[in-house]
C-alpha cells in the first residue's frame, strides 16, 4: 500500500484507497495529475500536516515536477489550495459587515489625512489671533488610532449604526480635546510673550534711569575738576 507504486504517470491506488489516506499521507502522496488503475483522474488533495507552518499556497508557487512531489522532505512550498484544505487555519472567513464599514470609514479618514488635511478647515486649529494652523499628520493619525483602540476595548456590538455613531462621537470628542489643548498651548505662549514684553519694557526704563544717573555723576565730577 505505501508508498504508492507510480510508474508512467499511473497510480496503483483505487478511488477508495485514495479516500482512506489520512492528511499526513495525503501530503506524501504523489500529488500530480495522473490516472489511477481504474482510469479515474487522480487529483489527490494536499492537506496541511499540523506540524508544518502555513507559509505559501500551493497554487501561488510554480507547479512542481512529478519527482519533486514524490519527495518526503516536507517542503513548505507544496501547500494545499484553500478550497481543498481541511484545516480551519487555511480557510478564508468573510469580514463581518459592521467591521468592514468601520474599516472603510477609517481608510477614508486616513486618505483624507494624507492628501487633504492641509486644506481642510475641520483639520486646522484656529488660534485666538485668528491665525489657523494645520493639525500635524501624526496627531491626526493618533486621534484616529485612539478611537480604534477605544472601540476595541469596549468590545464589538451587533448594532452597526450604534458602532458607527459611537466612533464618530469619539472622533469628535478626541478632535475637540486636541483643539482645546492646542488653544491652551497657544494661549500659554501668548501669556509668556506678554510677560517678556513687560519685562523688556521695565528693563528699558531701568536702563534709562541708570544712564541719566551716570550722566549726572559725570557732570558733577567734571564740575569739581574745573573748580580745582
Swiss-Prot record:
InterPro entries: bZIP (IPR004827), bZIP_sf (IPR046347). GO terms for biological process: defense response to Gram-negative bacterium; regulation of transcription by RNA polymerase II. Pfam families: bZIP_1. The keyword Plastid does not apply. One of its GO terms (cellular component) is nucleus. Disruption phenotype: RNAi-mediated knockdown targeted to the intestine, but not to neurons, hypodermis, muscle or germline, reduced the resistance to infection by the Gram-positive bacterium P.aeruginosa strain PA14. Reduces expression of pmk-1 pathway dependent genes, such as systemic stress signaling mediator sysm-1 and infection response gene irg-4. It is found in: Nucleus. It comes from the Eukaryota. GO terms for molecular function: DNA-binding transcription factor activity, RNA polymerase II-specific; DNA-binding transcription factor binding; RNA polymerase II cis-regulatory region sequence-specific DNA binding. SUPFAM superfamilies: Leucine zipper domain (SSF57959). Residues 203-210 are annotated as: Leucine-zipper. SMART domains: BRLZ. Its main location: nucleus. Residues 166-202 are annotated as: Basic motif. Belongs to the bZIP family. Interacts with CCAAT/enhancer-binding protein cebp-2. Transcription factor. Involved in modulating innate immune response pathways, acting to promote resistance against infection by Gram-negative bacterium P.aeruginosa strain PA14. May act as part of a feedback regulatory loop with the pmk-1/p38 MAPK pathway. May also function in concert with CCAAT/enhancer-binding protein cebp-2 to mediate immune responses, independently of the pmk-1/p38 MAPK pathway. This is Transcription factor zip-11. It comes from Caenorhabditis elegans.
